[in-house]
Amino acid sequence: MVTYISDYKKLVERQIENEAEMRNRGGKRTETRENKAVEKERESMTTHGKKLLKASIDKFENTIQTFLNENNRGPKFVAKKYLDQLEPRLTAVIAAKKIIDSVTSVRKFTAQAISLGGKIEDELYFQAFSQSPENKALFESINKDLDKRSNHYEYRRWKLLLSSKRKGFEWDRWPVRDKLLVGELLISLFIEATGLVQVEKVFKRKRAYNVLTATKKTLEWIKNVKDFNKFFDPEFYPLICKPRRWKTSIGGGYISRHIEPMFLVTGNNITSHRTYIEELKNYDMPGVYNGLNTLQETPWVVNKHILNVAKTVFNDDSRNRGGLITSKLMELPNKPHNISDKSPEGLKALSKWKSQATIVYTQNQKLKSKRLAEANTIYIGNKFADEKQIYHVGRLCFRDRFYYVTGYFNPQGTDLAKAMHLFANKKPLGTVGEKYLCLQLANTYGEDKISLDDRIKWVHKNKDQIIASAKDPFNNSFWEHADKGFFKLKKKIKN
């Protein structure tokens, strides 16, 4: 008894260390993601950027509306005639997002103002293009296609401009001075409404110019938000001891203070959702809690055979099996010889090459993302390969569906993630269990359209190839042709 208590105490201590590691890895991931957003001038998509955007829109909109209601003369009137064509709310969103996208950077004021004015012109341009009856269907079709491809502003803008020019759409481009006036006005109104940024004069090489920077107060606030939120997005691992049981709507799952108490139902950490979670405490839900606890207290082990196969094929492209993403990316198309030529033929060749290159680039980004997910799956599987038991914390979505919180490596994950899991407590299959194993083997291979009896017969007919694949998956390729290759290989090994 003493030995058992001592061993379990050590297990809990190791689990707490794992949760500290989860927290730190999540913090580094968040920091890396936000640094990339700053580099790409997409700071409005960060945690602090979203908060600034949400807090500034209403005040900024009211300030714009007040300005438009006034009878202005002079340079401001030039900007006013453009802004009158847009809803103040839309103008506020576009301008605030553009300013906040690089809020912690030091930007030359003139360049920032011209760029902001260009964003307003783009909006008016595409509104005019989409509202004409002959172009409306085309605009919607292009946008739908772009939603599947990319959310990068410059790429979307280029595709829409290209399509509008092909349709012969005409537009009087704004003079640079007008873009500057529109941008200057919106920046000054943003400063007036929010006080988040300021214009400063700096001197460099005996020259003076204005820059747009965040105020000292804003920078301090951003630092505090970053420090506070850095560790609120941990990289969830499996547990090596039983999770904390769900007894109420808050606090089940991980066992230490390193992880913030979880909500029973997933959702944004906003007032309305927190109110809903608090309200759930008033309801007696033994069936819900018992079901959750039963699932997350089910012990698993890592399937080492599948793990070793996955590690081998992942790290050696020449032995790739089972549909894993190789390290090789698609090659960009060769540039045409006249790509630098400004003639109509050269410009046409450049446009065609860009279209082809964009498709390849987008596909490569997807491949990189999938390979990274596979790498994380293998990493976590390898980390817990020698544990006698592992557990996965579970929660509910707003539809009351059960989901594990562990990223990448969990029994509800990809073909690879599922295949790397085995129940820790073994039980004999029996006659009925053998029947369902055969059905699952046939299903994962893609033989799921024939009758149940024919599926069982199919398994017995291919028994020798199934066993050969399990014994030597690198020299027997039968399992690779399955719809779910690694899951199929797992079933063969179990058989």
Set out the residue ranges of the language-model regions:
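Non-catalytic nucleic-acid-binding interfaces of large nucleic-acid enzymes and RNP effectors
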Residues: 1-495
